[in-house]
Amino acid sequence: MPRFYSISTTDFRPISFENVYLYGEYKKIKNFLVSNNQQELLKVLSIPSYKNNNIEWSASTNNEIKKLDEYSQTQQDKILSQYNEFLNSYNSFINALRSSKNQDNKNWGELLFSLIEGTANELFSDGENIFITWGWRLLDENSKKLIPVYNPPPSIAEDYPKEIDKEID
């Protein structure tokens, strides 16, 4: 699996859950998502590895992976739309876990909620699939927001003037 990105641990701090750094729990997270038929959510999560005070990220793809800002605005909008779809699915899954009567599911819901709530999530794409970094926070959380907010274009019906809706006598 090719590595496509690296972050220095001097600029970021790991997110922990119950005294465990989340980036070190990738295999457990992967197994849980696979056992719950959430492969589509799993493939968005980049694979972290710690090496020489850096976290190196890789993903399962044969295509070149680039940062969001390396794409045209049209392509960025498409990627951000994919990211919003991912967040909707991810949040639905998390909410189902957190509202479960099973304590183990509730714990997994809390862990997965913590996974991408940090300020250091960055968005990448290989032109078809999206990938995010996760499990880290910027040391200075006010310095920047790494994934811009996607505002979908208004629907065609919203573009028409309201006068068109009036009946003509």
Residue ranges and their predicted role:
Residues 1-168:
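Cytosolic/nucleoplasmic/matrix-facing N-terminal domains/tails
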